[in-house]
Curated annotation (Swiss-Prot):
<feature type="propeptide">
    <location>
        <begin position="23"/>
        <end position="43"/>
    </location>
</feature>
<keyword id="KW-0964">Secreted</keyword>
<keyword id="KW-0732">Signal</keyword>
<comment type="similarity">
    <text>Belongs to the frog skin active peptide (FSAP) family. Cruzioseptin subfamily.</text>
</comment>
<dbReference type="InterPro" id="IPR004275">
    <property type="entry name" value="Frog_antimicrobial_propeptide"/>
</dbReference>
<comment type="function">
    <text>Has antimicrobial activity.</text>
</comment>
<feature type="compositionally biased region" description="Acidic residues">
    <location>
        <begin position="30"/>
        <end position="41"/>
    </location>
</feature>
<feature type="region of interest" description="Disordered">
    <location>
        <begin position="25"/>
        <end position="44"/>
    </location>
</feature>
<dbReference type="Pfam" id="PF03032">
    <property type="entry name" value="FSAP_sig_propep"/>
</dbReference>
<keyword id="KW-0878">Amphibian defense peptide</keyword>
<dbReference type="GO" id="GO:0006952">
    <property type="term" value="P:defense response"/>
</dbReference>
<dbReference type="InterPro" id="IPR016322">
    <property type="entry name" value="FSAP"/>
</dbReference>
<keyword id="KW-0165">Cleavage on pair of basic residues</keyword>
<keyword id="KW-0929">Antimicrobial</keyword>
<feature type="signal peptide">
    <location>
        <begin position="1"/>
        <end position="22"/>
    </location>
</feature>
<dbReference type="GO" id="GO:0005576">
    <property type="term" value="C:extracellular region"/>
</dbReference>
<protein>
    <recommendedName>
        <fullName>Cruzioseptin-7</fullName>
    </recommendedName>
</protein>
């Protein structure tokens, strides 16, 4: 009977250790996914900032060109 208890205890202990290791790996994978999502959102934000600045520059250039055309037409 004592041998059976020891075997059962050993099986339960090893199962618990295995479960703990699996949960830890799962948490690490989730953390990596969250970190990748953060990196992607930072890249998107950076890209949108560049597009915004380019748009502003193009808008200013177009406004200046239209203003010059109007000034030339008035003269």
């Amino acid at each position: 009977m004592a041998k059976l208890k020891k075997s059962l205890f050993l099986v339960l202990f090893l199962g618990l250790v295995s479960l703990s290791i699996c949960e830890e790996e799962k948490r690490e994978e989730e953390n990596e996914e969250v970190q990748e999502d953060d990196d992607q959102s930072e890249e998107k934000r950076g890209f949108l900032d560049v597009v915004k600045h380019v748009g502003k520059a193009v808008g200013k250039a177009a406004l200046n060109a239209v203003t010059e055309m109007v000034n030339q037409a008035e003269q």
